[in-house]
Amino acid sequence: MLDRIKVCFTESIQTQIAAAEALPDAISRAAIMMVQSLLNGNKILCCGNGGSAATAQRFAANMINRFETERPSLPALSLNADNVVITAISSNKQHDEIYAKQVRALGQPGDVLLAISTHGNSRDIVKAVEAAVTRDMTIVALTGYDGGELAGLLGPQDVEIRIPSHRSTRIQEVHMLTVNCLCDLIDNTLFPHQDD
């Protein structure tokens, strides 16, 4: 059992090291995109399923409340947080539309959609991205594996942050770390620390 624990930690560390080498440019571009959207008076919508839903909610909470330091609230909304809306849409046998309908209702040109999917093939996330494109939103996609269908929907103005792994658990771990990096970059760009 102790060896298995060490394997889990080692795999996680190796995935983080690979991500640290491969992803800084994409993470930086995503943060700049989000900052520009916020400075223009827009908002960030985010969505995911399962563990990715938790990551989306964490991002929105960090924007609205704070990340590591006190600052004004920033407009972000997790589309998977409203169970009434999600179950209302699902009860009409439109599960694939649970995020797309919300994007069409709430998304405005200049907003950002943070779409999180470990394999990039979740139908409801794909449809949310398609809806965001029709609303002239930009997209930040957190993916893994080969990026799936989601990667093929992105335009040159969008950013894919693809975790270099083929294990969902490792991908989700680095998605959370990536969200923390985005929050840190957004905060430090909009509200630079005096002691930096």
From Swiss-Prot:
Protein species of origin: Photorhabdus laumondii subsp. laumondii (strain DSM 15139 / CIP 105565 / TT01) (Photorhabdus luminescens subsp. laumondii)
PANTHER family to which the protein is assigned, alphabetical: DNAA INITIATOR-ASSOCIATING PROTEIN DIAA (PTHR30390:SF6), SEDOHEPTULOSE 7-PHOSPHATE ISOMERASE / DNAA INITIATOR-ASSOCIATING FACTOR FOR REPLICATION INITIATION (PTHR30390)
> What's the source species' lineage?
Bacteria, Pseudomonadati, Pseudomonadota, Gammaproteobacteria, Enterobacterales
Function (record text): Required for the timely initiation of chromosomal replication via direct interactions with the DnaA initiator protein.
Kindly state which keywords UniProt assigns to this record, in alphabetical order: DNA replication
Q: PROSITE patterns, per this entry?
A: SIS (PS51464)
Per the record, the gene is diaA
In its UniProt entry, what is this protein called? DnaA initiator-associating protein DiaA
Give the family from UniProt: Belongs to the SIS family. DiaA subfamily.
Quaternary structure per UniProt?
Answer: Homotetramer; dimer of dimers.
Instruction: Tell me which residues make up the SIS domain.
Output: 34-196
What NCBIfam families does this protein map onto?
A: PRK10886.1
